[in-house]
Amino acid sequence: MRLGTPLSPSATRVMLLGAGELGKEVIIALQRLGVEVVAVDRYEHAPGHQVAHRAHVIDMTDGAALRALIEAEKPLLVVPEIEAIATEALLEIERAGLAEVIPTARAVNLTMNREGIRRLAAETLGLPTSPYAFVDSYAEMCAAAERLGYPVIVKPVMSSSGKGQSRVDDAGEMRAAWDYAVRGGRVDKGRFIVEGVIDFDYEITLLTVRARAASGAIETRFCAPIGHLQVKGDYVESWQPQAMSPTALERAREIAAAVTGELGGRGLFGVELFVKGDTVWFSEVSPRPHDTGMVTLATQRQNEFELHARAILGLPVDTGLREPGASAVIYGAVDARGIAFDGVDDALAAPGVDLRLFGKPEAFARRRMGVALATADSPDAARLLAKAAAAKVKPVPV
C-alpha cells in the first residue's frame, strides 16, 4: 500500500461519515499514517471536525447531498461511523466506482438497522439469538410481547447508544415503552424489534478485525474479549479482558467470524454477544469501532481505532493485549453549550489513569462527554480506578 502526503496531489484521502468521539480517534489514527481526512457530520464543530483536514456539515440521510459531497471530495475510501446514513446512495457510489465503502456498502446497509443484521444472523447464518419479532404498530408490539412472554426488550430498528430501548416487565408498561421507542428512533421511526430476555451471565464485545495477511488474503483476528455494563442499552463502563471459559471463547470467535465473514470487506467490527456458561448468543454487530472498545486506548498494543485504520488501508495489524484495563463514562450532567470540566487534575492524580474529553459543543445530562481510562494488575482493580476517576470530573456550565 502506497500512502501519499496530505494536502498534496499524492494524498491518500479518506472521508468519515460521522465525526463523533469514535470518529475523532479514527481520524487521529489515520493522520498518524499520513492520510488526508475529511470529516462529515450533521452539526458544526463535532469532535472529529476539530482534528480533520477538512470538515463538512450535511444531512447524511439525504442521498443526493451525500453523493454530491463524495463526488466533490473524491475520497479513496468512505468510512461510515454512524448508522443514520443514506445507505442506498452508498450502494450506488460503490457500484459506480466513485469510492470504496468500508467495509462494503452491503455491510453498511445490512447493519444500519437491527432488522437487516438480525435476519442475516438468525435466518441466513442460523446463529443463536434471542427470540424476536419485528413490528410496525402498538397493537403488533403488544401481541409480540404476549407471544414471546414477558419480560421483553423493545427497541427501534434504528437507534444508537440505547436511545428508545427499554425493558418491559408486564403489559402495563407497554404504552410507555412504545412512546419511548417512537421518540428514540433515528430514521425509520415506525418499525421496532421486540426481543425475549435471555438469562445470561454477562455480555461482551468481541472486536473482530478483517485485515490483509502477508499473503494478501483477508484473515480474521480477534482482540481479547471486552466485558461491559450497560444501563438502558447505553454503555456505562467496559473492561478487558473479560474472563471466559475456553469453550465459550471459541464459540464466540466462531460466531464473530461467521457474521463478519458474511459481511465481508476490511476493517474492525464490534460483535456483541451474550454468554451463559459455555453458551453464547449473537446480539448485534457494528462494522466500525465500538464505544465499549474505548478501553483499548489503554490496554492494547494497537487500540481499536489504530486497528481499523490499518485494516482499511490494507496494512498489518496486531490485536495483542498489553495489560488489563477499564473505562468509565463521563456524562454531561448539565444541559448547556460550551461547558467546562472541573476536577481533571484530581482524576489524573491516580497512577495508571488517563482521560479523553471529547470536545462536544453541547452537553446534555446523559450525553457522553468523555471517558476515564485505567490500567491495573486486574480488570476489577482497573474498574475501580476508572470509576473513581470519572466521578471526579465535574462538567459545569460557563
Curated annotation (Swiss-Prot):
Subunit: Homodimer.
Domain of life: Bacteria
PANTHER family: FORMATE-DEPENDENT PHOSPHORIBOSYLGLYCINAMIDE FORMYLTRANSFERASE
Single annotated GO MF: ATP binding
Residue span(s) of domain ATP-grasp: 119-313
Family: Belongs to the PurK/PurT family.
Keyword terms of this UniProt record: ATP-binding, Ligase, Magnesium, Metal-binding, Nucleotide-binding, Purine biosynthesis
Enzyme Commission number(s) from the entry: 6.3.1.21
Pathway: Purine metabolism; IMP biosynthesis via de novo pathway; N(2)-formyl-N(1)-(5-phospho-D-ribosyl)glycinamide from N(1)-(5-phospho-D-ribosyl)glycinamide (formate route): step 1/1
Binding annotation for Mg(2+): 272, 284
Gene3D superfamilies: 3.40.50.20, ATP-grasp fold, A domain, ATP-grasp fold, B domain
Binding, ATP: 114, 155, 160-165, 195-198, 203
Catalysed transformations (reactions): N(1)-(5-phospho-beta-D-ribosyl)glycinamide + formate + ATP = N(2)-formyl-N(1)-(5-phospho-beta-D-ribosyl)glycinamide + ADP + phosphate + H(+)
Record-level GO cellular component terms: cytosol
Function noted in UniProt: Involved in the de novo purine biosynthesis. Catalyzes the transfer of formate to 5-phospho-ribosyl-glycinamide (GAR), producing 5-phospho-ribosyl-N-formylglycinamide (FGAR). Formate is provided by PurU via hydrolysis of 10-formyl-tetrahydrofolate.
Ranges that cross the membrane: none
GO BP terms, alphabetized: 'de novo' IMP biosynthetic process
Ligand binding (N(1)-(5-phospho-beta-D-ribosyl)glycinamide): 21-22, 81, 291, 360, 367-368
PROSITE patterns attached to this UniProt entry: ATP_GRASP
Name assigned to this protein: Formate-dependent phosphoribosylglycinamide formyltransferase
The protein's enzyme class: ligase
